Amino acid sequence: MFDQLGVESGLVSSAPDEGTFRLRAVLGEARVIPMLSPYRNGTDVFSWARDGSIVPYVESIYRQGTHRGFGEFHLNAGQSGLPVVRTLLAFAQRENLFLQPHADARAMAELLPLVTDQTVLWAHAGVTATPDQVEALLAKWPKLWVELSLRDDVAPGGKLDARWGALFAKYPDKFMVGTDTWTVGGTYTGNERWDAYPDLVRGIRTWLAQLPTELAANIAHRNAERFLAQLPR
């Protein structure tokens, strides 16, 4: 599928972690960039920040030099100071792992002052964060980058939103595309997101085509390549 769609690589995490490496064995090391997830199963998404057993789990599965970042991890406002969260943030810093938080603008505003020396890739551009909120954090935190999966509001109905377009132009080196093919139970019990993957990619390319060529190339792949290249090994 990646070959057919021209997708070169992606950040991948699994619950449990072994799924990432099964996929990597099939697609190759260059295609699958492993992320260190704090989740053993779907329920950990909601409880990990207060579950002390997550710390030894993360430490036990960590593959030094192979996992490139810590995340995606869900973080609510008021949770950045919790002991489990602080312990794993410190672990990520010691191991030179970038952070990939799934957090709204308020939670990010609490997190970023605690991790000023760490590179942060903001998952889903804050999920519900407005362009103004994203801009405010980018202006303040130079080590913050932004990933755009699940943000249908970037191009409602396929037409690029003017506010997002202006923000991309102001920060041409900070944004990158994403798709997010999660499976969480309930409605999503199988391969629904993977089945929709070609449509997701085509939708992204539709709004990228509405940007200037160089800016579109940055968001499509160049920024992600630069992001990975500047990470410590």
Where are these regions (language model features)?
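A general structural detector for well-ordered alpha-helical segments in enzyme core domains, enriched
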Residues: 1, 20-23, 54-61, 84-88, ...
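Mid-to-C-terminal alpha-helical segments outside catalytic/metal-binding sites
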Residues: 1-9, 13-14, 18, 173, ...
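Divalent metal-coordination and catalytic microenvironments
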Residues: 2, 10, 34, 70, ...
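Flexible loop residues that form catalytic
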Residues: 15, 75, 125-126, 224
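Active-site gating/metal-coordination segments in enzymes
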Residues: 17-100, 145, 150-154
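Active-site gating loops and adjacent loop-to-helix segments of metal-dependent hydrolytic enzymes
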Residues: 30-33, 141-145, 185, 191-205
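Catalytic pocket-lining loop regions of alpha/beta-barrel enzymes
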Residues: 36, 82-186
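Short, flexible/disordered intra-domain loops and linkers
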Residues: 42-50, 155-160, 186-196
